[in-house]
UniProtKB/Swiss-Prot annotation:
Its main location: secreted. The lineage of its organism: Viruses, Riboviria, Pararnavirae, Artverviricota, Revtraviricetes. May regulate immune response to the intracellular capsid in acting as a T-cell tolerogen, by having an immunoregulatory effect which prevents destruction of infected cells by cytotoxic T-cells. This immune regulation may predispose to chronicity during perinatal infections and prevent severe liver injury during adult infections. Residues 25-27 are annotated as: HBEAG. Residues 178-207 have a biased composition (Basic residues). This is External core antigen. InterPro entries: Hepatitis_B_virus_capsid_N, Hepatitis_core, Viral_capsid_core_dom_sf_HBV. Residues 165-214 are annotated as: Disordered.
């Protein structure tokens, strides 16, 4: 299996640091988390079950439909675009390697073992990467991080003490916008309240009565 990882590094010729982090972490077991620079962690994404993530094909179709022009552009759009490019390229190289291994292994059991390992273990990592960066581009990084935290709290809460349904990512932007608006408002104490205005009226009446007496 170590030889398989070595073949992966040789075939994964992505020139950027993001791809190097991904490949080197798989090979030598280095403590490299590809999500840390984006404010998340592998552990945070692990709260989401494996069947939560769409298939690689569906994620690739989504990325192509929404961000094809930006992904194919030579310009640097954002760190998420760069990471998404490298994840797509690594998956393509990985599929090429898996096909080559499958065609050249004579033992059917070994061939199935390699294919299943790629589809389950590495396939899940690619699905997580694709989902994370596509979601950050679609909904915003802060919204995705808030969703991961909310889902982690929900899944770790005993069923008797949590809502029946898990948080939904598409509904979080509405609450996030409201919170940002609340933060941007000026403090209400700067403007006089109706109670203060009412409290001033008796004083004015007293002053007017004193002037009339004089």
């Amino acid at each position: 299996m170590q030889l398989f990882h070595l073949c992966l590094i040789i075939s994964c010729t992505c020139p950027t640091v993001q791809a190097s982090k991904l490949c080197l972490g798989w090979l030598w077991g280095m403590d490299i988390d590809p999500y840390k620079e984006f404010g998340a962690t592998v552990e945070l994404l692990s709260f989401l079950p494996s069947d939560f993530f769409p298939s690689v094909r569906d994620l690739l179709d989504t990325a192509s439909a929404l961000y094809r022009e930006a992904l194919e552009s030579p310009e640097h759009c954002s760190p998420h675009h760069t990471a998404l490019r490298q994840a797509i390229l690594c998956w393509g190289e990985l599929m090429t390697l898996a096909t080559w291994v499958g065609n050249n292994l004579q033992d059917p059991a070994s061939r199935d073992l390699v294919v299943n390992y790629v589809n389950t273990n590495m396939g899940l990592k690619i699905r997580q990467l694709l989902w994370f960066h596509i979601s950050c581009l679609t909904f915003g990084r802060e919204t995705v991080l808030e969703y991961l935290v909310s889902f982690g709290v929900w899944i770790r809460t005993p069923p008797a003490y949590r809502p029946p349904n898990a948080p939904i990512l598409s509904t979080l932007p509405e609450t996030t916008v409201v919170r940002r608006r609340d933060r941007g408002r000026s403090p209400r104490r700067r403007t006089p309240s109706p109670r203060r205005r009412r409290s001033q009226s008796p004083r004015r009446r007293r002053s007017q009565s004193r002037e009339s007496q004089c």
